[in-house]
Structures are given as C-alpha cells and as structure tokens.
Design a protein with these regions (language model features):
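Membrane-anchoring hydrophobic helices of lipid-metabolizing enzymes
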Residues: 2-121, 154-160, 165
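Active-site catalytic microenvironments for nucleophilic, acid-base chemistry
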Residues: 27, 133-137, 173
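Catalytic core of membrane glycerolipid acyltransferases/transacylases, capturing the structured
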Residues: 115-168
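Single conserved hydrophobic/aromatic residue that forms the stacking wall/gate
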Residues: 169-177
Length: 177
C-alpha cells in the first residue's frame, strides 16, 4: 500500500520539479536543454539514495574494475539520464529533424503493414528514439516499458510517448506493490 507521504508530499513535489524543468527545457534550445539536464543530474544524482545502489550494481557487474572506473561509469549514467530527460521536451523537433530511417531489405518486410514483426532493441541513450523512428515509418508500433514510479509524472510521459513514440505495454512498477 502506498504511504500517505508519497501520495500527499513526495509525488506532488517530484511532479512540480518535473513540470518546472520540462518547461525550462522546452523554452531552451535543444543543445542548451541537454547541457542543463546533464548539469542537474550529474550534480544532484550522486547525492540521491539510488546512487548507492548504482555503485553497488556496477561493482557487481564489473567486479574487475577499480573504484575510479566504477565512479566514472556512474557519472556517465547520470549524464545519460540528464541528456535523455531534457530531450523529452523536444521530442517533436527531434522526430522532425534528427531521425532518418533508411529502408533496406530487412526494413521493407518490417514496414509492410500486412506483416507482423518483433524488433528487439537495445539503447545507450534516449530510449524513446527507436520507437519514434519506427513510428515515423509505420503507425502500428508497440513497446514494452517499465513506467516511472511517480504516477503523476507517468501520466505526462505516457501522453508524450503516445503522441510521438509507441503504444505501450507496461510492466508492474514497484509503486504498484
């Protein structure tokens, strides 16, 4: 069961920060939005409780790496998150000016509306880009995602994904338990 604190305080405060920065990112040009997003996440991220879990998981996954490498990798995670979050405010312009899907022998079958295909995608930056790229070529695209923990933020993210990216199938998030 969700705690009253999360419902009445934490989620609304996170949502206000989200809307504030989303608006700032929307006003700024894409390049400046990315720089600000990176500045925010690399400055704040290491002080959040989740940072300890990030360090622990990186240390387990890369047990042969030294502490300096682990810390650098964690910083790159925060940098990537800032880059990605700032791009949410610019999804429309990214879709119009930054994405080019080139047809080839494989994509011809995938983009045929009469065929069914499963595409497995990995990403190292903005996880919305593959869905946006596919959506630019065909309308019926779905994705399986994990929703943000905050239901207020999740509502906005769902709207953005529906408008610019994919129909979503979601997995249960920790907030649902």
């Amino acid at each position: 069961m969700k705690s009253l604190f999360k419902i009445l305080v934490k989620y609304p405060l996170e949502f206000l920060f989200f809307i504030f920065f989303f608006t700032v990112f929307k006003i700024l040009p894409l390049r400046m939005s990315r720089a600000l997003g990176i500045l925010i996440t690399t400055s704040v991220g290491p002080f959040l409780p989740i940072h300890n879990l990030l360090i622990k998981n990186l240390s387990i996954a890369f047990h042969d790496k030294d502490k300096e490498w682990i810390n650098d990798a964690a910083n790159r995670v925060w940098k990537n998150l800032g880059y990605t979050v700032s791009e949410y405010a610019h999804m429309n312009s990214i879709l119009k000016s930054k994405i080019e899907v080139i047809n080839n022998e494989f994509s011809d079958d995938v983009f045929n509306e009469n065929e069914h295909s499963v595409i497995v995608s990995g990403h190292s930056s903005n996880w919305e880009i593959p869905g946006m790229a596919l959506r630019s070529k065909m309308n019926r695209v779905s994705a399986i995602v994990r929703e943000p923990n905050n239901p207020l933020i999740n509502f906005v993210v769902k709207q953005l994904r529906h408008k610019y990216s994919c129909l979503l199938y979601t997995s249960p998030s920790p907030r649902d338990s």
